[in-house]
């Protein structure tokens, strides 16, 4: 796992079949709804064999899965959350930036409204699984004058024009879960891709 830079596809599918990606996600969306204690047990047991493997489980159960579960439309849940539970798609959570860290209020990624669309420019750094993911939940400022209250979350698919991924970071460990930047250059996203409400990320 550490040498190849990811867990094998066969193992990934088995993890999905065993509902590792949906320990905290309700059954109606493909999870098992067992809660956080169960997730901690799963993580602890996985870590005995591979710490990298735990990162594949953490994201869909927390930073990626819960925002979609709690704030996504039913269409977004069916399109993104359910396939992640099945192991058909991988997603990631993109907040951290080179100059702002994880402080959303000082980030430099900007989403400019253009009719029913938003034009997004910026760079996210140290994003877990960025080289592997099919989509990302990206945070961008839709109103810079409002600081943290002007931040909006967008679901952006990897094949959207202007979306690219940087080279994987050279790390001291946990290399089985690659980390890289996500670069957004004039990425055009429809308003239907907003996660939750504008300015309420």
Which ranges hold each PLM region?
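Internal helix-loop-helix
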Residues: 17-88, 128-135, 147
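Residue-level signal for inorganic ion chemistry
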Residues: 42, 73, 122, 154, ...
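A structural signal for short hydrophobic beta-strand segments in well-ordered beta-sheet cores
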Residues: 111-112
């Amino acid at each position: 796992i550490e040498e190849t830079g990811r867990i094998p596809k066969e193992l990934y599918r088995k993890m999905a079949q065993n509902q590792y990606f949906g320990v905290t996600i309700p059954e109606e969306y493909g999870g098992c709804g067992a809660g956080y204690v169960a997730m901690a047990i799963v993580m602890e047991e996985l870590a005995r064999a591979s710490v990298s493997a735990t990162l594949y489980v953490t994201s869909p159960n927390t930073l990626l899965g819960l925002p979609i579960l709690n704030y996504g439309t039913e269409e977004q849940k069916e399109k993104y959350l359910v396939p992640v539970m099945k192991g058909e798609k991988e997603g990631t959570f993109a907040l951290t930036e080179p100059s702002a860290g994880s402080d959303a209020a000082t980030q430099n990624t900007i989403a400019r409204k253009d009719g029913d669309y938003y034009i997004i420019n910026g760079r996210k750094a140290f994003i877990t699984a960025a080289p592997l993911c099919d989509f990302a939940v990206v945070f961008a400022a839709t109103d810079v004058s409002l600081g943290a209250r002007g931040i909006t979350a967008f679901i952006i698919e990897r094949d959207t024009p202007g979306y690219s991924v940087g080279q994987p970071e050279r790390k001291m460990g946990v290399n089985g879960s690659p980390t890289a930047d996500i670069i957004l250059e004039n990425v055009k996203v429809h308003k239907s891709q907003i996660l939750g409400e504008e300015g309420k990320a």
